[in-house]
Amino acid sequence: MPETRTETAAGPSPKEPGPDKDRKDTLLRRYGIFLAAAVFLALYLMPNPAGLEPEGQKALAVFCGALTLWVAGTIPIYLTSMIAIIALALTGTVGEKTAFGTLGFNVIWLMVAAFVLTSAMVKSDLARRFALWMVTRFGGTPTRTLAILVLINFVIVFFIPSTTARASLMVPICIILLEIYRAVPGKSNFGKLMMLLGVQADALATSGVMTGTAANMIAVQFIYDQAGGEIGYMDWLLAGMPMAMMSMCLTFLVGLRLFRFSDEIDFSHGMSKLEEQHRSLGPISLAEKKAMAIFALTVTLWATADYQEIWFDGFSISIYVTAVIAAVLCLMPRVGLLEWKEANIKWDLMIFAAGAYAAGNALESTGGAEWMIGGLVRGLGIETMSTAAVYVVVIFLSMFSHMVFTSKTVRTTILIPSIIALAQTLGLNPVTLALAASFTLTYTITLPPHSKVNTLYFATGYFSVLEQLKYGIVTCLIGGTVISVSVFTWFKLLGYDL
């Protein structure tokens, strides 16, 4: 990870936050723990609502209390996660083995491996060489550099069917770029925007390609099994990719307004320095060749993960095993590039992720999340709404349902069949309504624990939980609006009836 610096590559240090922003942040930090305690106690002690099991109520209390603390930032996020795990165990929400077992989840191993890979790419200078080449060749301005990173995400989604694998490839490149620009983690608006755009681009690009994530394919199967609609690869691409690209363009423009960096980087003078740094790397070294070979093997295994079972008679190597294999190769004497002490693994993030998954999984397994969504649907009175209103409400409910469902797969499994049943009850086209909702499934972008991609980018330290929450909500609103408008325009041109 880049070291904190006091200057940018070609200009003054980033502007400090204004007094109003500082005051708000200070108040939230100061009273966050009391607010979290109040939220927890209010939910824990309230009379048990109809349809919600006692364990579900406890899980809801723990989840919302932890969420409040994560956003407030009163105490370190890993400490909040540890408190959440303790609370789950002491309240009997889940068993101790379940609560503590999240530290052994495959995503934790994936994150450890990703940090090893990142450290290897940084040490070998391969990531620096690629980043410098990319910026000096195509990134004439900081804005163009950001646009190129977004474009790369939209290209590799066709070849690497894993959101986490794509993030694991992009994060080291972003780190090196920001190191070149001397962007200070936590202070640089340019750094915040680059990392947050990485989160948004990964999610939005995935929504446009059916094979971008397993959740998309599960949704397609539900639509076929329960609604009789056959959605092919090109059907999904034609419907989803234009919406994804439009949403990304709007999100990109909004991000430039939210995180202004014009006074932070004097890029006109910095380009010559970047070109000089690129030339100074000289010929490709042995370490870079090793890193390139490991990188190529990793990308190949990730990109072919969905086809290996067909090719090798049921045998396949998952993205998690692939990542650990790559990490082992990086650490292997003679073959690799690193010693263990050189691998910059953020163990505090591992604890944070474990607690986040424990709280989120408890909410799902106890029925708390499903109860919240069901109550919201009933409370809004969807059954009495017009057709247009039903579509808009369902799309936005699906969009923001990731706030309580931490797993895209679980979210898909619960939402899509429910939406199909709702459409059939109301006499609407279940294929169109379910497909529209399916395009929201990848928008897990508002908080770090909502996806593995988020945790990988968040681990860089460039943005806070609150900053991701703000930008994520804006992006979800943009995406929901674009999908809603498209249902009544673009979908009709493609032949989908309401």
What are these model-predicted stretches?
Residues 180-186, 241, 354-359, 363, ...:
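C-terminal transmembrane helix pair
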Residues 48, 65, 78-185, 347-349, ...:
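Membrane-embedded alpha-helical segments and adjacent helix-loop junctions characteristic
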Residues 68-76, 152-162, 199-210, 396-408, ...:
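Transmembrane alpha-helix interface/packing and boundary motifs in multi-pass membrane proteins
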Residues 52-56, 74, 103-104, 121, ...:
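Alpha-helix capping and helix-loop boundary segments enriched in small/acidic/polar residues
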Residues 1-110, 235-374, 474-476, 480, ...:
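Hydrophobic transmembrane alpha-helices of multi-pass small-molecule transporters
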Residues 83, 148-149, 197, 239, ...:
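Hydrophobic core positions of alpha-helical segments in small-molecule transporters
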Residues 181-261, 453-487:
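Membrane-core helix-loop-helix motifs of multi-pass transport proteins
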Residues 106-116, 160-168, 236-252, 432-442:
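Alpha-helical transmembrane segments
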